Amino acid sequence: MSFRYLTTFLAVSIGFLASAKTVIVCPSCEINSIKTAVEKADSFDRIQISEGIYNEFDITINKPLELVGIDRPTIDVQSKGYGIIIKSNNVSISGLRIIHIGTSYTKDFAAIYITKSKYFVVENTELENVFFGVLVEKSHKGTIANNHISSDAVVEAGSGNGVHMWHSSHIEVKENLLHNLRDGIYFEFVTNSTITNNLSHHNLRYGLHFMFSNENEYHYNTFRNNGAGVAVMFSKKIIMTHNTFTKNWGSASYGLLLK
């Protein structure tokens, strides 16, 4: 980006932020639905979600927004679909608990589904009883950090992955706890991304799984009690340093599988 374009971008962004407002959501407030808050908010507004249980699903974000949970509010999807769907650039999600993502054999339902987005952040969330945790498709330049993602996977066919990325690039996945899933982290056609300081354990298949994903790095992660620690399949230029593999139990592979 040239200096001229960068200056214009910063000026426009600062102008938006200067006019941004905070939309308050709580069970007893005038706005007691996250969907309603998203609809009423303008681009670059902050939606502050207070403690409580919100029985909602398919909360779709089509504009730049910041969603912030206060005292860990819970979105109970009740196995009805996706939790939050992000279809815009510049979206940030933090401080939320999202539960009960139902299993499907026709759709990849996820607690947070990100598609065709840039500059997104998902951090400090708890995603429980998920099919997929954070599902990222055709998205770039994002961060997934400090999340706790878990399920109760029993068989591979009926379970999904904690962080699942497809046709994406320049994503940072760091300091997440992922367990009892199919794969903790799964990359397919993903490039120029980094995976650092994650703990991925007790997953049915792999702690970390690369498929057709080139020029990625993973460092300082721990892979414990998985079918296999890490699988690098049909992928090139993967840099791997300072990772710990322990007590992985698969019959065909243990710590690191290269194919």
Residue ranges and their predicted role:
Residues 20-55:
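Acidic Gly/Asp/Thr-rich repetitive segments characteristic of extracellular carbohydrate-active
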Residues 33, 56, 207, 217, ...:
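Per-repeat structural element of leucine-rich repeats
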Residues 1-7:
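Bacterial N-terminal signal peptides that target proteins for export
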Residues 42, 62-63, 70, 87-89, ...:
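Parallel beta-helix/beta-solenoid
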Residues 77-85, 105-114, 129-132, 136, ...:
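Extracellular beta-strand/beta-solenoid scaffold signature
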Residues 15-17:
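N-terminal signal peptide c-region/cleavage motif recognized by signal peptidases
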